[in-house]
């Protein structure tokens, strides 16, 4: 039902849907999946496909074992495999008159505000031209320190910057179960999840498929981003024939419901950051002020963790080390180390130059 009401839909495909355990291409599956995308376009929906598989296909072409690859070698393999991946899509989608484009993203493209806006503009223009973007992480240049790490989180960030109505993660299971169904026969599918609590975290499977880099844990991480961005997210079985049609007709999947009905685009971007650069631990007085919609001042800061620059994403933590909010810092970490615990009227004196008094302005902050 959530899919039917969605205008912009992001669909993530795992490597295991492209290439099976015997390293054979799932040509029939791709052809059927193209019919699903064709149907969504007929319903006037904007569709984005986030597809894994570049490294797996590169390994297949070069006859390499993915598990033995080091980062620098995997980057080269990814550049080879990305061509193979796009050729597969082109072969199966062009016959159904589906126009395709390719977008390769790095972490900074969604984490830096200006680049995120530019990326959204590109996507919007592609929708106007009736093209379906195929998105992947730019593994050939991304380093381990600046990677999404898996395409589940990449897909959730793409959904977030596009203000997409829903994200569908196609996997090799029907959704999230009360127990791992591959081990426990009494495991039951959870149809809807409103809150990702400790129990949900616990039941999330940590199993990893032969070709993928993620598991159920990364899908839960993606769901958290979607919930805080106002988007619906589904985990569904992609191995079924016509998986999107199956969601439409049977809704046999797990839906994560958004926590936030509406946030402006700027605050969505702030709250959904994958990699905040630091933490500010604040006192009870500061927490009470923030609850009333006030800005964070230096006087309420007890401690600081991490090194960051002005404008970077940071977490605001209470005395019990619980995350209360996220925001954009008005100061760098060195400056905050000097002014923490001080009254605002002393900041200019301490730093030796005139600056603002708010460490995190209320307009640059979102409560978790």
Report each predicted region and the residues it spans.
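C-terminal catalytic "cap/lid" subdomain
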Residues: 1-66, 71-99, 103-368
């Amino acid at each position: 039902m959530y899919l039917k009401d969605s205008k912009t839909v992001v669909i993530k495909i795992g490597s295991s849907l492209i290439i099976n355990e015997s390293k054979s291409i799932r040509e029939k599956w791709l052809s059927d999946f193209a019919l699903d995308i064709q149907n969504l376009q007929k319903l006037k929906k904007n569709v984005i496909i986030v597809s894994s598989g570049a490294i797996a296909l590169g390994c297949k072409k070069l006859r390499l074992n993915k598990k033995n690859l080091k980062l620098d070698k995997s980057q080269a393999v990814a550049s080879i495999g990305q061509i193979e991946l796009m050729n597969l899509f082109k072969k199966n989608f062009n016959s159904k008159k589906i126009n395709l484009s390719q977008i390769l993203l790095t972490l900074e493209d969604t984490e830096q505000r200006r680049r995120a806006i530019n990326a959204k503009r590109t996507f919007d223009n592609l929708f106007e031209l009736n093209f379906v973007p195929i998105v992947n992480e730019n593994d050939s240049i991304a380093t381990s320190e600046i990677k999404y790490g898996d395409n589940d989180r990449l897909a959730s960030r793409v959904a977030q910057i596009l203000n997409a109505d829903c994200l569908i993660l196609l996997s090799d299971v029907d959704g999230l179960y009360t127990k791992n169904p591959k081990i426990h026969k009494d495991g039951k599918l959870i149809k809807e999840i409103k809150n990702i609590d400790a129990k949900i975290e616990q039941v999330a499977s940590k199993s990893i498929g032969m070709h993928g880099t993620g598991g159920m844990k990364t899908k839960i991480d993606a769901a958290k981003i979607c919930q805080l961005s106002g988007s619906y997210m589904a985990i569904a079985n992609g191995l079924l024939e016509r998986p999107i049609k199956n969601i439409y007709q049977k809704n046999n999947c797990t839906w994560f419901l958004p926590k936030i009905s509406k946030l402006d685009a700027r605050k969505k971007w702030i709250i959904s950051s994958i990699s905040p650069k630091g933490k500010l631990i604040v006192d009870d007085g500061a927490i009470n002020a923030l609850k009333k919609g006030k800005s964070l001042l230096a006087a309420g800061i007890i401690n600081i963790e991490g090194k960051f620059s002005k404008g970077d994403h940071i977490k605001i933590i209470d005395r019990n080390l619980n995350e209360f909010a996220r925001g954009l810092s008005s100061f760098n970490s060195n400056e905050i180390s000097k002014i923490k615990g001080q009254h605002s009227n002393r900041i200019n004196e301490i730093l030796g130059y005139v600056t603002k008094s708010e460490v995190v302005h209320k307009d640059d902050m979102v409560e978790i």
